[in-house]
Amino acid sequence: MEKQMNQQILKDTIKQLFANGKGLLAMDESTGTCNKRFAAAGIPQTIEMRRKYRELIVTTPGLNESIGGAILYDETIRQLTADGTPMAAALVKAGIIPGIKVDTGARQMAGFSGEKITEGLDGLRERLAEYKTMGARFAKWRAVITIAANTPTIASIKANVHALSRYAALCQEAGIVPIVEPEVLMTGDHTIQRCYDVTELVLKTLFYQLYQFDIDLEGMILKPNMVIAGTESATKNTVDEVAEATVKCLLTSVPAIVPAIAFLSGGQSPENAAAHLNAINKNFKDRLPWIVSFSFARAIQQPALDVWKGEETNVAQAQKLLYTRAKSDAAARRGEYNTAMEQKK
C-alpha cells in the first residue's frame, strides 16, 4: 500500500515539474565548480557570494513561467535569502519545486585509468530523509562516462549504472523522484557515431540494471546527454543531424513508459543547446513517447553570471537574462524556438 502511495506521489511530482511546457534548472554546482566559474568571471569565491548568486536565481521574477523545478546543492538548501527565508522555501513561494543533488562527486575508478565512479551511497537513506524535511521532492545523481581510445570499459559502465540504480531505489523508497543522469562527456575528438554507440550501450546497460533493481520507471526522470561529436572532433554536425542521432538513440534504448527525458547541456553553448532541443521536439514531435525537456545549468545561467559579476547594481539585468534564457529553452521544449529570440535580450 505504501509503495502504491509513493508511486502516485512520484507521478504527481513529475507531472508538476514539466507542466505547461516547463523544464528544470540545475543550480547544483559543487563549491569547487561554483568557485571555478566565479574565478573566471572575476567574482570573489566566498560562501556569501555563492549565497547571493543563488538568491539572485531563486528570486528572479517570472522564472516559474519556464522552470518547474530547480536542483539545489547541499550548501544551498541550507542557506537563507537576505530576508531569512530558506532557499527551498523561496523556490516554493516562487512556484518552483525544490530538488537536491545527492551524489558526492565522481572519483578516479581504481584500476581503470581515466575512468570515474560516482560516490555518495553511504548514509544516503538518512540524507534523503533530511532533505525531504527541508522541502526536496526530487533528487539527482550524475554518473560520468568518458570516451577515449580504450574507454569506456564495460566495468566502468556497469559500476556506474549499479550506483545509479541503488540511488534510484533509495529515492523511490523515500517518495522522492530520482533524476537518473548517465552523462557521456563531450570532451574528446570522437565522432557523432562513436558518441551514439557509447550512449546506446550506456542506456541499455542502465535500463537493464534499473529493471533488476525493480525501479518504477514511471516514477523517474532520465537526464541524458545529446548524441553529439566531441569538442575536439574535426567534423561538426548540423543541428538536424544531432537531433536525428539523439532521437534514434533514445528510441532504441529508453522504454516508452519513462515519463520524461530532461537533457543535460554538457557544456554546449546556450544557443546550441536550445537549437538542438528545439529540433528534437519540432522534427520528431509525433515519434516521441516521452516528454522531452531540459535540465540545463550553464546553458541557462552563464549569460546572467557574466553580467552579474558579483555587483548588486547588476542583479536586475542578470535576472532579466536568466528569465530570457529560460524562456528560450521552454520555447525549444515546445519546438517553437528561433534564434531571433536571442536578439530580444
Which residues make up each language-model segment?
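Helix-rich catalytic cores of soluble enzyme domains
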Residues: L124-Q212
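Residues that line or immediately flank small-molecule/substrate-binding pockets and catalytic motifs
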Residues: D74, A143, P224
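Short, histidine-centered active-site or binding-site loop motifs used for metal coordination
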Residues: T104, I145, V184, M226-I228
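Alpha/beta catalytic barrel-like cores
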Residues: E2-M134, I147, T235, V239, ...
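Hydrophobic residues within beta-strands of alpha/beta enzymes
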Residues: A70, A139, P178-I179, M220, ...
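Conserved, mostly hydrophobic/aromatic
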Residues: T46, W141, V180, L222, ...
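Proline-centered loop/turn at the N-terminus of a beta-strand
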Residues: I97, V177, G219-I221, A260
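Catalytic core of soluble alpha/beta enzymes
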Residues: M186, H190-I257
